[in-house]
Amino acid sequence: MQFDDFANHVITIEAESADLEITSLVSKLLTTAGNMDDKTLSTVVRFIKGTVFPAWSSQTLDIGPALLHTTIAQAAGPNVDSADVENRLAEYGEIGAVAASYDLNGQQGLSAFTPSTPDSLTVGHVDKTLRAVASASGDGSESRRRNLLFGLFSQASSSEARVLARLILGEMRIGVGTGTVRDAIISGFIEPAADADKKTLESREDAKSVPPASQPEITNKISGDTSPNTSESVQTKKSDPDTSSNVDPSAVVERALQVSNDYGMVATIARNQGQAGLIDISLELGRPIQAMLAQAADGVDAVDTWDAVAIETKFDGARVQIHTDGESVSLYSRNMEDVTDPLPEIVEFISQKVTVPAILDAEVVAVSDDGDPLAFQEVLRRFRRKYDIDAMRESVNLNVYVFDCLHIDDADLLDIPLRERREKLRELFNTTDALSPFQLTTDPNVIAQARSKALSNGHEGVMLKDPDSTYNPGSRGQHWLKHKPDVETLDLVVTGAEWGEGRRANVFGTFVVSARTTADEQQFNSLGKVATGLTDDQLTTLTEQLRPHVRSEDGQTVMIEPAIVVEVGYEEIQRSPTYDSGFALRFPRVVGIRHDKAISDVDSLSRIKHLTTGESPD
């Protein structure tokens, strides 16, 4: 597929605002690419989402704005420098428009940098080149990366340059999210195949005499129903195409995406094998999936909702997904970054304890020499360490607590109940020492006692889980609840913002929130950025209220005069050098816009310190 064709599809999608029409246009793009080889289709799916690599891959381009600006300037000609690119960025507001504003196509001397460059850009060549950019390392790697990018931009038309620049920074800005791509796969490949199957069935002379196909195993696999024979549900089964055609296609595609964590792969299988092929996708060692997530819970209402409640300790640690083939071990963070090398003691522990292929969900916790839990930041010190790992290992001790299993000994376990997964976990380790504490109860008092014990031991609280629930990757439903102490909200003032993307390109999508430096001053220090908690309508309203207070703009970033107060919830306040207050909010969210409060009512840093350290406020 010519990259120019892809770019024109992207620009057409960008001009559309209606969600259904955007899905239709993406579907048209996929079916166009679908007439080509598997690799091209897979690449187009990733590109339309603004990524070069599958979601499960920890590989990144790692191209910052500065290098991109320099490369665009180089491709634009000798009279253009990066300062000119940055000036245009301030004028146009986004890098794609800046790249499109230059006459890049036709630069000479390409053969010195990319001797295998085709006469025109193709999707495959762009993908191959960007992968080479990501792989460049060692002495001279930055120069090689710049030359490779220069080779692409030097051949790019205006539309190609617009899309290429956005793709490199992972900012497509066209309103295409994961749900859009999922629905486009359904409408492009699943529904047409289902219609064709239906017509074939209707054309049979004996169609009326054919009884409905039985499909218990497929329904169980897609719906997560665990009431029938669950021992069969973990076995490897091939789907009957006639049966699978009766399953909700949305559920089939969603489940395939959860298990594979690869949109390109799912699109290719949907085209080639239909629903039956998607149903047969299974977990794979070395291909991490999204973690199942929990919602915050204010009380013990779960007792009234579930038949029983599973209680686990809520650690103040970092989530890891453990993959082992019974010998070698790989560790992945919640963001699917490979963290195997920084955590050698966890690798050693799992290697000793687990001798069969397995995928496990666990929490890594930093502990003192006495075994007491340390703050979350200490764990991050280990995760981020690339050098002198042995020295850091001596400095920060780690424990691992395994609390779930997704795959054991060639069997996927996502669709069996939590209580059964925990039993398999106990059998796998043949001990409870490595496992997160686990107990079942129907008594609210037991939950309260467990939470009190966890808090007194220095942990965050408890997790409450439905013992009959299946494991839904990437889902934040009502089956896992975080039961922690109530945290007060903060009244903070908006002092900056960033423009949104896609459908939210004309409103602020992220806000910098700040506290007063002292209780009697009108000076402010930032505590972080918040991007959740507001509806589209609320974002529009808040943007209009903030516009008169804009001090300056620099590309996507806006400086704002302190005027509008927002109520912000959070999970924790941490010390951080990132913001000038010296603190940062963990998982902040806007609870509401406080029009009833003036900036003099904004919380002070002394209160922040009090909430963090217990020091008396001024």
Swiss-Prot record:
| PROSITE patterns xrefs | DNA_LIGASE_A1, DNA_LIGASE_A3
Annotated binding of ATP, by residue: 312, 319, 334, 363, 403, 476, 482
UniProt xrefs under Gene3D superfamilies: DNA ligase, ATP-dependent, N-terminal domain, DNA ligase/mRNA capping enzyme, Nucleic acid-binding proteins
Q: A GO molecular-function term, please?
A: metal ion binding
Keyword Membrane listed: no
Compositionally skewed regions (Basic and acidic residues) per UniProt: 197-208
Cofactor requirement: Mg(2+)
Q: Which reaction does it catalyse?
A: ATP + (deoxyribonucleotide)n-3'-hydroxyl + 5'-phospho-(deoxyribonucleotide)m = (deoxyribonucleotide)n+m + AMP + diphosphate
**What residue spans carry the Polar residues bias annotation?**
216-234
Q: Which residues form the active site?
A: 314 (n6-amp-lysine intermediate)
The protein's Enzyme Commission number:
6.5.1.1
* Residue span of region Disordered: 197-250, 459-480
Query: Which keywords does UniProt give here?
Result: ATP-binding, Cell cycle, Cell division, DNA damage, DNA recombination, DNA repair, DNA replication, Ligase, Magnesium, Metal-binding, Nucleotide-binding
Q: Which InterPro entries match?
A: ATP-dep_DNA_ligase, DNA_ligae_ATP-dep_bac/arc, DNA_ligase_ATP-dep, DNA_ligase_ATP-dep_C, DNA_ligase_ATP-dep_cent, DNA_ligase_ATP-dep_CS, DNA_ligase_ATP-dep_N, DNA_ligase_N_sf
- What is one Gene Ontology biological process annotated in the Swiss-Prot or TrEMBL record? DNA biosynthetic process
Instruction: Report disulfide bridges, numbered on this chain.
Output: none
**SUPFAM superfamilies in alphabetical order:** ATP-dependent DNA ligase DNA-binding domain, DNA ligase/mRNA capping enzyme, catalytic domain, Nucleic acid-binding proteins
Function description: DNA ligase that seals nicks in double-stranded DNA during DNA replication, DNA recombination and DNA repair.
Instruction: Name the protein family.
Output: Belongs to the ATP-dependent DNA ligase family.
Q: What is this protein called?
A: DNA ligase 2
What is the source species?
Haloquadratum walsbyi (strain DSM 16790 / HBSQ001)
What gene codes for this chain? Answer: lig2
